[in-house]
Amino acid sequence: MTPELQLLGDAIFEAAKKAFLKLFENREHYYYCVVLTTGEALPPCIAAWSVEALERFINENAIPQEEIPYYKYSFADSPYYAFGYEEYFQQVVQLFEQRDSLIDYNNEEQWNEEYNLRLAAMVYAMKKLDETGIFAFNQPREQVYINVELMPPDDTDIERALSLNNPDNIEEWLSIFG
């Protein structure tokens, strides 16, 4: 692991850990926990869904039964989208801004390297979070889909989902997005 990847990954890990731990204080039962970034690999944020939050959302918005699976995994509709971003991700934002100043965006090879480094740092952070047991705080880990997702989603989300989760545990997600 390069020093750049380690530094960025550890910063994302610390920020996401603080945000998820604060979120999990509400004692809800989570099934969707992700780190999100844009297709340009801008500084990430987290998003999450819990069983309780989904139930509230369905009731408040009169969501038809057949549409529930699409909302169930929608970061954009999550009440916990970008949770803790202002409080915990400022160091991550600073690191991304510092790296931005070193990149020649007209150099496609250099930008691709940077993009891949940023995504690798996010994946590293999610793996490290998973190893701490954080996603088993209010529910069994097997019930939680974790990932590093892109906005808008693309096929690489599936690759990362399969590497971060047991495929048997994310069959519903795979049936929708796979």
Task: Identify the meaning behind each predicted range.
Residues 18, 22, 26, 98-102, ...:
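Surface-exposed polar/charged interaction patches
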Residues 131-178:
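Glycine-rich, aromatic-bearing surface loops/beta-hairpins
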